[in-house]
Design a protein with these regions (language model features):
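Short connector loops at secondary-structure junctions
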Residues: 1, 79-80, 142-168
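Non-catalytic alpha/beta scaffold blocks inside enzyme catalytic domains
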Residues: 1-141, 171-287
Length: 287
């Protein structure tokens, strides 16, 4: 039920924007509005947007506007639930605006695609969206295209998934990977005093919040000055800028290699972590 960005550009004849999308993806929406899919029977894509009234919508080329699907000021999750309910022919406490236009477009569609991001959609909204797409696939075809708010963050999630079988917030305290998004929430662990050492890795320098008692901070970041409050600061390079890297690309929906734009002598985060691990553990780390 997922689709690649390239397939969306080529085939999507109905595009449904679910919630607010990060600004880095607004150009994709404009590109979709300015091109014609090869499966369209009317030589034009139909655009809908799901969300409360007043929600910002990426601009479409040619002065076009997306048809709003909303339940007034109801939340995104509630609107998706109502949309799913109406699609099944059941009654709702508040109908979705322009639902008949949406139903007609889906009936004629050959390749509808829902654009979404975890940036503005919480868990229940994403669950309702997946349910709606599953319902549509029982009789026709529909797909979802995930547009991450942060490409580096999503790349890290994919790397965690292929190495452990789970996304981030996975722990190894018992010798094997355990996915627990609540227990392994770093911010919660620090606030609760469960941690006595915080290793922070970030290309952007950020001042830490109020220092917690008994917790030391080791900061790996691109900086020329020590990070305030850190016991140790180690300068690292930025992937794709200071050194060659493999990064996630939303445009292709996959990983790609990139050369350093301004190569420097700053080491990569992976190099520093491996050096730390070589002194902290008797056995070498896996690749």
């Amino acid at each position: 039920m997922t689709v690649a960005p390239g397939e969306t550009r080529r085939r999507a004849d109905v595009v449904v924007i679910v919630g607010e999308l990060p600004r880095i993806h607004h150009s994709l929406v404009g590109e979709l509005a300015g091109t014609v899919p090869d499966l369209s029977t009317v030589n034009q894509r139909a655009f809908f947007v799901v969300g409360p009234n007043g929600m910002s919508v990426p601009p479409l080329n040619g002065g076009r506007e997306a048809t709003r699907l909303s339940c007034g000021q109801a939340s995104l999750a509630a609107t998706l639930a109502a949309l799913r309910t109406q699609y099944k022919g059941r009654r709702t406490s508040q109908p979705v605006s322009n639902f008949n236009d949406f139903a007609k477009a889906l009936a004629a569609a050959r390749f509808p695609v829902f654009l979404f991001s975890g940036h503005a959609a919480e868990g229940l909204a994403l669950e309702m969206l997946q349910g709606l797409i599953a319902d549509l696939n029982r009789n026709s075809r529909a797909s979802g295209l995930h547009l991450p708010a942060n490409e580096n963050g999503w790349g890290s999630t994919l790397a965690s998934a292929w190495m452990t079988g789970f996304p981030l917030r996975t722990g190894f305290a018992r010798g094997f990977p355990e996915f627990d998004p609540w227990r392994c929430d770093v911010a919660r662990m620090i606030a609760a005093g469960e941690a006595d050492l915080h290793l922070r890795i970030s290309a952007a320098t950020a001042q830490p919040k109020e220092k917690k008692r008994r917790m030391a901070l080791i900061a790996l970041t691109k900086t020329q000055e020590p990070v305030a409050g850190a016991a140790v600061t180690i300068a690292i390079g930025e992937a794709g800028l200071d050194h060659d890297a493999v990064v996630y690309s939303s445009r292709t929906g996959s990983l790609r290699s990139t050369e350093a734009q301004a190569a420097s002598q700053l080491p990569s985060a992976a190099t520093i972590i491996r050096l730390i691990a070589s002194h902290a553990f008797a056995e070498p780390l896996p690749c």
